[in-house]
Structures are given as structure tokens and as C-alpha cells.
Curated annotation (Swiss-Prot):
One of its GO terms (cellular component) is extracellular region. This is Sulfakinin. It comes from the Eukaryota. InterPro entries: Gastrin/cholecystokinin_CS, Sulfakinin. Its main location: secreted. GO terms for molecular function: hormone activity. The modification Pyrrolidone carboxylic acid is found at residue 1. The lineage of its organism: Eukaryota, Metazoa, Ecdysozoa, Arthropoda, Hexapoda. The modification Phenylalanine amide is found at residue 12. Myotropic peptide. One of its GO terms (biological process) is neuropeptide signaling pathway.
Amino acid sequence: QLASDDYGHMRF
């Protein structure tokens, strides 16, 4: 699932 981490990047 896609989720934006604390850095604002997209992680799969």
C-alpha cells in the first residue's frame, strides 16, 4: 500500500 513517509517520499 502506498504511504507517504515523514520525509514526504512515497514508499511502496
